[in-house]
């Protein structure tokens, strides 16, 4: 149940904040990673603020719980001008699955990887969180099955 709660919460928050405004977005204004400060990878993500190989490996590992993966992404945070962590994660997934990023689609990815990609997209682009909705909905559907 806990595994599906965070993705559902994030999807609902995206629907609430999908219109671009200058008010704080619940996606970017809620630093829930603070509750996971005892997790080494969360600490690292907060300090680095950018996707690296170790963070990407952590997000793709089936051994790590989805709530901790979400906390890692939340700890990477966002910038008003945008970030490219989703793009960096896509490159990692291409290497992992031995595919070019143009060939990579969600059929090759786990539900957790799809969720991580969606949440990274939402965090990367403050003004267009709706771009993440299709991936988050797909991840949620796969997690329910």
Each model region followed by its residue ranges:
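Bacterial N-terminal signal peptides
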Residues: 8-17
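Short coil/turn linking the two alpha-helices of tandem helical-hairpin repeats
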Residues: 76-84, 119-128
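Short secondary-structure subsegments characteristic of cysteine-rich extracellular domains
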Residues: 131-145
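N-terminal alpha-helical interaction modules that lie
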Residues: 22-107
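Alpha-helix boundary/capping segments in eukaryotic regulatory proteins
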Residues: 107-110, 125-134
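Residue signature of alpha-solenoid helical repeat architecture, marking inter-repeat boundaries
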Residues: 63-67, 108-115, 144-145
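Positively charged n-region of N-terminal signal peptides that target proteins for export
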Residues: 1-4
């Amino acid at each position: 149940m806990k595994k599906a709660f965070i993705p559902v919460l994030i999807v609902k928050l995206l629907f609430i904040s999908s219109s671009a405004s200058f008010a704080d977005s619940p996606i970017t204004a809620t630093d829930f990673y603070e509750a996971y400060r005892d997790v080494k990878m969360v600490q690292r993500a907060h300090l680095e603020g950018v996707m690296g190989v170790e963070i990407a490996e952590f997000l793709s590992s089936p051994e790590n719980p989805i709530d901790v993966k979400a906390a890692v992404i939340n700890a990477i945070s966002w910038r008003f001008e945008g970030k490219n962590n989703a793009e960096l994660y896509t490159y990692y997934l291409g290497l992992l699955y031995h595919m070019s990023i143009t060939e990579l689609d969600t059929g090759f990815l786990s539900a957790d990887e799809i969720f991580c990609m969606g949440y990274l997209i939402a965090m990367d682009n403050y003004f267009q969180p709706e771009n993440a909705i299709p991936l988050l909905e797909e991840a949620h559907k796969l997690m329910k099955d």
